[in-house]
A protein has these predicted regions:
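Asp-based, Mg2+/Mn2+-dependent phosphohydrolase catalytic module
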Residues: 2-29, 100, 104-105, 110, ...
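Alpha-helical substrate-recognition element adjacent to the catalytic core
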Residues: 3-93
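Active-site phosphate-binding/coordination module
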Residues: 85, 92-100, 112-114
């Protein structure tokens, strides 16, 4: 997942406090500003370093970002990954669709998310880790 996992939860806080419309407007306005790193940025960076030792088509590791975001909020994510100089193999912007089916289709080995509901759906298809970070886990 992206927000509160790979990225900080700054955008998720806006969504939780003010709703989808405010989130979309905020992300569109900040599209050229990279997001701050979240708790798994180091893990993704390490995977990227391993991947960079191999040609893309021969890498033993494939990475995917599967997020509830959709256009226009995808632009900030893409620009952030470019600013970090991190390549991912797949990016799925699901616009709120259930993540479990997509994880199954992708053939993921493991998935990390900050929201318990997304973890429940994903865990039916793939080993799943609940990242206890961010506004979705407060309280």
């Amino acid at each position: 997942d992206g927000d509160a996992v790979l990225f900080s939860d700054e955008a998720e806080k806006i969504f939780q406090a003010h709703g989808l419309e405010a989130f979309a407007a905020s992300e569109k306005a900040a599209a050229r500003e990279p997001l701050s790193g979240g708790p798994f940025i180091g893990f993704l960076s390490a995977l990227h370093q391993i991947q960079s030792l191999f040609p893309a088509e021969d890498s033993p590791i494939r990475t995917a970002l599967i997020t509830a975001r959709s256009a226009p909020a995808h632009e900030r994510v893409i620009r952030t990954l470019r600013a970090w100089n991190i390549r991912i193999d797949e990016a799925l912007f699901l616009g709120g669709l259930d993540k479990g089916r997509f994880l199954k289709s992708f053939g993921a080995d493991i998935y990390f998310d900050d929201q318990a509901g997304h973890c429940m759906s994903a865990s039916e298809h793939v080993a799943t880790g609940h990242v206890l970070h961010g506004v979705a886990n407060e309280g």
